[in-house]
């Protein structure tokens, strides 16, 4: 993990309380400008007119379908789903390309480990600056480790605890996807030991999938 080919961004902007804080701010600005945020709604149709998306329909959490005119549509859904839900004169070539796209699903396991060295400064940004560590071992399911302490110290309440975000690539509905939280945590801890990230004596405080 501490080889010569380390890639580490020296400077970047990151919300004090995590990425979710940015979207909370966005939501507040939308509301202040008179916008309405529909939670639990599912877009089921996008109407293409003269190569422009002008109308969408979505189903609210109560089951009611709503149609909305739009000047601008910003989509964050996978392109395959976006084109599958489009109606109107959509070029066949674009539908074909979108249908052929493959996506990976991801399970993120939050793991808190008691790490007394953090409190006395032995383990710090100076000697361990990594925020993300990519694991490239074909025998290991774990793909990436996020060290939340190094993203922002305000994300961690206790100075003697190390919070990790462990990312596992899988496919929705497969064996790994269907693991229980306890089973997933057991694999996460086992693989951290295999790659030498933690020793056997480390205490796991809690975990959350």
Predicted region positions:
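Helical element adjacent to the flavin cofactor pocket in flavoenzyme catalytic cores
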Residues: 2-72
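Short, hydrophobic/amphipathic alpha-helical packing segments
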Residues: 19-23, 185, 189, 209
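Mid-domain catalytic core of redox enzymes
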Residues: 41-200
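A glycine-rich dinucleotide-binding beta-alpha-beta segment and adjacent secondary-structure elements
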Residues: 198-209
